[in-house]
Structures are given as C-alpha cells and as structure tokens.
Swiss-Prot record:
All residue ranges annotated as the PPIase FKBP-type domain in the record: 163-248
Function: Involved in protein export. Acts as a chaperone by maintaining the newly synthesized protein in an open conformation. Functions as a peptidyl-prolyl cis-trans isomerase.
Catalysis performed (reactions): [protein]-peptidylproline (omega=180) = [protein]-peptidylproline (omega=0)
Enzyme Commission (EC) number: 5.2.1.8
Recorded name of the encoding gene: tig
Entry keyword set: Cell cycle, Cell division, Chaperone, Cytoplasm, Isomerase, Rotamase
Annotated localization: Cytoplasm
Family assignment from sequence similarity: Belongs to the FKBP-type PPIase family. Tig subfamily.
GO cellular component: cytoplasm
Recorded domain comment: Consists of 3 domains; the N-terminus binds the ribosome, the middle domain has PPIase activity, while the C-terminus has intrinsic chaperone activity on its own.
Coiled coil: none
Name of the protein described by the UniProt record: Trigger factor
Pfam families from the UniProt entry: FKBP_C, Trigger_C, Trigger_N
Length: 436
C-alpha cells in the first residue's frame, strides 16, 4: 500500500492511498460466496442460488461495503504509522488516475493541534474563599422550621400578614372577559413567600376573612403566560380563610425530628454547620475551577479542529432541543436553532478540552485509584446510607467515568493554583450561594 500525506491549511491534511485492485476483488468474491450459502430467493432452495444470480443481485452493494472497509482500514493503519492524531472522520473520494491494477483514494481530514501553554507562573487567577457563619446556620434553621410549620385559624377580625396561609377565590378579567388560568376557587398560598406576583400579595395582605376586594394588576413583560404578559387585568379576590403559621421551637424535639444523632440544640447546629461546610467546599471548588479553566484558555495557543467544533455544536443543539421538548414545546425536534447561538460555547469547550488534555498528559495529572475512592466517599457522605451510594458508583462504568473526569479537573485546578499568580478573595456565604 502506497501512502502520501500533504499539508493543506492549518490542521487540514490530504492523504493519498493506493490499494491493489486484486485485494478488493478477492474480498468481494469471498463475501459473495459466503452470502450465497445463506441467501434466500424465490425459485431456489436456500444455499442453492447460482453464483451468477447472487453476483448480479448483490455485487454492487458488496463491492461498496468492501471498498468502505478496506479503505477505512488502510487509512487507520497509515494514520497510525504516520503518528497522525486524526480529529473527526475523513472525507474519502476515489481518484480517477490510478495506475493500472490499483485503486487510489484521497482522504481529507484534520489532525489535533499542538497545544502551546504559556508559562503558568504568569497566569492570574482569583481564588475565592468563604466561611459558614452563625447567621447562615440561623437561616438554615429557619428554613427547617418553616418546612415543619403548622397552621391555626386566625380570628375573623385578624388581617392576613406575611407568613399566613390564606385560602381565596379569585377571578381575573381583561376587557371584561375572564382569561385562561385567571380563575380559581379555594386557592391557597403563603403571604410573602413569593408564590404570587408582588402586586397580588400586596393586595391580599391586610385583608380579613370574608372580605372581598377588586384591584388592578400589571403582569410583567417577561411573565411566563404569554397571553397576559405586559398587560393589565382586574382581579376580584375573596378571602375565605386565614391561618397563622406556628414554627417549632429550636429544641431537642426539633433535633430528634430531624434525625440528629446528638439530639441537642448544639448537636443540631453542629450538624447543620457540617452540611453547610460540605456545600461551601463543593461550590468554592466549582467557582475556583471555572476561574482556573478561564485562565488556561487565555494562556494557550492552538488552532481548533473544525470537525471537533462541529461535533460539539451538534451536541449542544441536540441538548437544547431535548430541553425544549422537556418543557413541553411543540415540535421541539424541528425547531430551527441557529448554530451561531452555540458556536462560541462550542469553541470554548473544544479549546478547553484540548488544553486540559495536554496539561494532564504533560504533567501526569491522571486520576489515581485512591483519589477516585476518596471522591466517591465524599459524595456519598451526605446520604443516609453512604455505602449503598458508593456501590452505586462502583457498579457502573459510565458513572465511574464521570467521577474520573471530575477528579482530573480537580487535579488540574490544584496544579494551576500551585503555579499561577493567585489573589485571594473572601466572599460571604450568601454571595457564594447566590442568595440576597
């Protein structure tokens, strides 16, 4: 087999392959004979169809199949011998000027780039830190108490206030007509919890049981109901029942109800702090990891294989369609999604993947067995039966591959932070959690 490789633009290459014609013909004949032993045709017994008939019927498809197989095998062998790291699938076409007795093909393809990472000592990375404060523990305690709150009927002359559960009938109209979803009976919500629009809650707050009120309400322009978004409606609301919330005290009983081993107030707060610290650790790791990855992309030079970018584009668009379908969007699989919407993201992902792969290879940052074990145990620690979670991960190769990818990213993060110019920045617990 004769092979030549020509450099085209940037990462593009052209390989010319020459194969003996008799190799193709011999394989076609072998496959046709094998096919003749099992093929079924009207008028013939199984395995008794004449070769001339089998050849007439199947020669073209078998020849096409053999050509694909042989050329694909030849390309793979030649690329391996030439130490070419092929990105994507080659575009193969037959040449017309092949020497007699031979078949010649051109394969145009891309190779993965050489990745040049600048000196990481000059890279700048902002590393975040955060602590679990007493205020964060108190806020979590309040959430836990609200989840276990009970309600008692208010006196008839007591107005609705924040935290109360109200039962109402309401009807909203536009131009005198009730709109879809604008009417309900015995509807319940907690005043001040943000379940309803602020204008609606403001109108109900202060009303008493048995009271009715009519008021205008302006729907926001970005309201999820497109038929009413940006419009004004007139609502009639009748309050049927008001119930005041009663939160459990922070005591041993609450600790017991939450399944805390040390069923004391101190034990409860300690358990909450431990869980919050675990969450803080994971969130800080994610934020700092993103900062490191951004620094890596900035400090690397490389060309991107179009084949890899296109494959990533198609994956992102497919994910977008699946998301639309999950949201109940009609004909989501046919919705036109411009590639350019996702191109920057696809290019960044491909670039980052190539840079990380090179950094891992050059610095031996692969995941070690003890790291995988430690990470799985850490993930499982927050569950009631951690050993079952550990077994769940270990029993599936795809789940283990995900764990391995995370550990490698963590190794890369630690490696870069150990080399780069790192500036420390302390942020509040609420800022880290995205809370106001």
């Amino acid at each position: 087999m004769a092979v030549t490789v020509e450099n085209l633009e940037k990462l593009e290459r052209k390989m010319t392959l020459t194969l003996p014609l008799n190799t193709i013909q011999s394989e076609v004949a072998t496959r046709l004979k094998k096919l003749a032993r099992t093929v079924k045709m009207d008028g013939f017994r199984p395995g008794k169809v004449p070769m001339s008939v089998v050849s007439q019927r199947y020669a073209y498809s078998v020849h096409y199949e053999v050509m694909n197989d042989k050329v694909g095998e030849a390309f793979a062998v030649a690329a391996n011998e030439a130490k070419l790291r092929v990105a994507g699938q080659p575009r193969i076409s037959e040449k017309e000027d092949a020497p007699e007795g031979e078949l010649a093909f051109d394969a145009i393809f891309e190779v993965y780039p050489d990745v040049k990472i600048a000196d990481l000592a000059n890279a700048e990375v902002e590393k975040l830190s955060a602590e679990v404060s007493d205020a964060a523990i108190d806020k979590t305690l309040d959430i836990l108490r609200k989840q276990r709150r009970t309600f008692a009927l208010r006196a008839a002359d007591e107005p609705a206030q924040d935290g109360d559960r109200v039962t109402i009938d309401f009807e909203g109209k536009m131009d005198g007509e009730t709109f879809a979803g604008g009417k309900a009976e015995d509807f319940q919500f907690i005043v001040g919890d943000g379940q309803m629009l602020k204008e609606f809650e403001d109108a109900v707050r202060g009303m008493k049981s048995g009271e009715s009120k009519t008021f205008p309400l302006n729907f926001p322009a970005d309201y999820h109901g497109k038929d009413v978004a940006g419009k004004q409606a007139d609502f009639l609301v009748t309050v049927k029942k008001i119930e005041a919330a009663h939160l459990p005290e922070v005591n041993e009983e609450l600790a017991k109800s939450l399944g805390i081993a040390d069923a004391t107030v101190e034990g409860l707060r300690s358990d909450i702090k431990k869980n919050l610290e675990r969450e803080v650790k994971f969130r800080l790791l994610a934020r700092n990891k993103n900062a490191v990855m951004d620094a890596l992309v900035t400090n690397a030079e490389l060309d991107l294989p179009n084949a890899s970018v296109q494959a990533e584009l198609e994956r992102l668009i497919e994910n977008a369609r699946a998301d639309l379908k999950q949201r109940g969007i009609k004909d989501a699989d046919k919705a036109p999604i411009p590639e350019e919407l996702f191109r920057p993201q696809a290019e960044k992902r491909v670039r980052l993947g190539l840079v990380v792969a090179e950094l891992v290879r050059a610095n031996e940052l692969q995941a070690k067995p003890e790291q995988l074990k430690s990470h799985i145990e850490e993930l499982a620690a927050s569950y009631e039966k951690p050993q079952e979670v550990v077994r769940w991960y270990l029993s599936d190769n795809s789940r283990m591959a995900e764990v391995e990818a995370v550990v490698i990213e963590n190794n890369v993060t630690d490696f870069v932070l150990g080399k780069a110019k790192v500036s420390e920045k302390a942020i509040s617990f609420d800022e880290l959690m995205g809370q106001n």
